[in-house]
Amino acid sequence: MTRKRKTALAAGLLAAMLLGGCSGGDGVDIAQGVAYLEALEQQDPDAVDQILRQRRLEQLEREREELLRQVKAGEQDPFPLFQDAVILGDSRAVGFFYYGFVDESRDLTGSGETILDIPKKLDTLQAMNPRYVYLAYGLNDIKIGHWGSLQAHISEYLDRVQDIRERLPEAVIVISSVLPYHDPNARTDATGETPPTSGSSLTEADRKRLAQIPEWNRLMADAAREHGVIFVDNSAICQEYENLWEKDGIHVSKSFYPHWGKNLIVAALEEGGIADESASA
């Protein structure tokens, strides 16, 4: 290792030590760092890089924890954290781009889409090479009943996740739970009357299938855990912000997306993502 390289590493080590709260006082300086590295290098040439890597990992973990705290506390807008992510999903997910929360370059959603649309997006997704992939499918899948059972649909969903993993082995994949359907016919206003709706085209069979959404979410949560995939449970925000559903009982208003986006980002942060960049960089 050249002396120039040792000086740079010593400066990095010193910075890491100070960031880590390990200040050595006035006696810690670059010259001492170089001497320390030279002595350490004679014992183990790889030890220097190992120390710096460990310090970097510790620093990233502190940054991740602080970012998580800020997002949860509402001090950090979650949407800038989507800059290295891509969202795929149905018309509900389209709202992230439509309402201006996520840039069009990060959006691969489409109205009426299901997991059957994922294969045709793989080449584009691979070319985009995102660090994070958020999947928000399920409403249309459950409604059409194509798979015959929830378990069969979940199995194919996870097959499509595996397809993405094969194209993007380093990407973090996050599955959003399916937002519930609120039957407009079951709602009443302050007078006890059913308010007028925007004219949903759902059949009674559609409504019965959509009533399975909570069960689908439960089954997918278990399956995702078994397959090492992050699953985001949106049930709490869906209950808290039920008033943000549109009259059709399917779509959500613009005001709901910050809560949904926050949920997605928090899930990735809690699993060690977002701030956890490569320590070897």
Which residues fall in each region the model found?
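Conserved SGNH/GDSL esterase-like catalytic core that processes O-acyl groups on lipids
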Residues: 73-156
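Loop/turn elements at helix/coil->beta-strand transitions in domains of secreted/extracellular proteins
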Residues: 82-84, 128-133, 168-173, 227-230
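N-terminal secretory targeting modules
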Residues: 1-83, 271-281
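Catalytic His-Asp segment of secreted/periplasmic serine-dependent ester chemistry enzymes
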Residues: 186-281
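Short, well-ordered beta-to-alpha junction loops that form the rim of enzyme active sites
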Residues: 90, 177-180, 234-236
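Extracytoplasmic/secreted proteins, especially bacterial periplasmic and envelope-associated proteins
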Residues: 83, 87, 120, 132, ...
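Active-site segments of SGNH/GDSL-like serine hydrolases
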Residues: 136, 140, 165-210
